[in-house]
Amino acid sequence: YGASIPGLPGVIIGFNEHIAWGSTNVGQDVTDWYAIDWVDDTKTRYRFNGKEREVEMVVEEIQVKGASDPILDTIRYTHFGPVVYRSEDDDYHDLAMHWVSLETPNPEEITIFPRINRSKNYAEFDAACASYETPAQNFVFASNDGDIAMNIVGRLPIKREEQGRFVLDGDIQHNEWMGFIPYDKNPKVLNPPRQFVASANQRTTDDTYPYPYNRESFDQYRGRYINRTLDSMSNATVKDMMNLQTSSYSLFAEEALPLMLSNLNLTNLNAILKGLVELLESWDYIFEKEAVAPILFTEWFEDLEEVLWDEINVYDDSISVLQVRKWRTVDMLENHPLNVFWDITQTPGRETPEDIVTQAFVSMTEDLGWRLQDSEYTWEVHRETYIAHLSRSLEPFGRYNIS
């Protein structure tokens, strides 16, 4: 029993009479982009390691409903992978994509979930996982034998620290991947002393793991909160786990808000604004639908990010920019009060964290305006929660204005 994906044999997340299993995505970087040095404008040959190579021209046929003939698209393949974009107007033009999913597939991979579905113990489950390649998963496991485990499964490239963080020179052999991490070197744990395993897309290991991750795909707050909560339980019940799954407590707010409040200058705030500060000071970091504090916190933090990272955000409309993660803003508040990013370059003076945090607070209250005086304007209304159809285009099959 469990969840499946149309077209893929077997149950992806579920249980049988003996074991249960689930998964989340691994945050490992499995895609790199290489700038191709073409020999001439025909773009049929390119340079690599001081020698010329020919591209493979692959004609893709795209069938279109209602059309008598397919659309033909010629793709140039380098030894790295396809040159995805050709238009000079595209930021990724003339870049070859090396993506692990385009590697020659393992023919045994299609059998993994039927094998997991029939597994009776961890040994059989672990043997089935060895055939899995992409997309890499954090598999959690439990059995009637009392075993619990987590296996990180997938074909993960071996790369140097920071390799692939930015576009690589496609003419240099040193920039190629160094192979793939052997399956038996992928992180895994069976029956750990702490008596639980958990994954919420967070980083899987500490820094002692010998293979670089090279990418943090997710902020770690959710994973850290789940692990902290489980660690505090001595005899977890089904009810405890249900409460954890429906918890709206924010570890992010717990860590960020005290730093924001400690940097807030109250001197020029009127009585109404000081009342909002008191509301935030007494907040329990739970995003209850009837609460107002979650509105104040989220809007204040967003305004803080906008002012703090203005030198980066100014390029949003012109070039592709890596967005700064929330944890980095919290880290700036806690550990880097003298960092140059706190300064607004357009002003003659040098701003401090107190200046920026206070400016963001005032900006937040101005943005919310009259809504701050409306007793019915709560997190439920502000959040505007909706559940769209998976296609994102069939509105009658979605739920909107849930609040």
Where are these regions (language model features)?
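Mature extracytoplasmic enzyme cores
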Residues: 1-274, 278-290, 311-314, 398-400
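Acidic, low-complexity N-terminal propeptides/linkers enriched in Ser/Thr/Asp/Gly that mediate export
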Residues: 132, 144-148, 155-156, 197, ...
